[in-house]
Amino acid sequence: MFDVDILFGTEAIEALQSALSPTLDLLFILFTLLGEDYIYMSLIAITYWCFNKRAGVQMSYVLLISAYLNYWLKMSFNMDKPPSEYRIILKDDISHGFPSGHAQNAVTFWGWAGLKLRKAWTSILFFTLIFLIGLSRIYLGVHYLGDVLGGCSSGLSS
């Protein structure tokens, strides 16, 4: 029988945080920052102005759809984030946890970019980035494993 506590309990957070170190903290904070909206907006602007206007517009639509879907899902499920004692960052954050917006947007944005570029090395790079952004959210204690997996799943659908 599957134990739902694996997805929405603190076991995954505790397992990752058992390796806590200032270096890992900094590394995972950097990966989380790569999943912030302002990074995506900057990349979209650079793409639009420097490379390909059509791709920049498409990227905007893809991310906008993902953001609306994430908001709707968070409001629908209304699930809390992990307790603040597990959080390395955002200790006072009261936003909803499921699904992880960082994981969802990473899958949506980097997955779309990988499909557009169609190069093996970019696909590997983008998949690794998606994985590390999701993992960072668990390590930093701001999401449960289930939040991140839900974000990845909803990212695939947006």
Task: For each feature predicted by the language model, list its residue ranges.
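N-terminal transmembrane-helix/juxtamembrane module of multi-pass inner/ER membrane proteins
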Residues: 1-39, 70-95
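Membrane-embedded catalytic cores of phosphoryl/pyrophosphoryl-handling enzymes
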Residues: 28, 43-44, 57, 82-158
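Polybasic, low-complexity association/targeting segments
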Residues: 38-62
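Alpha-helical transmembrane segments
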Residues: 1, 62-67, 126-130
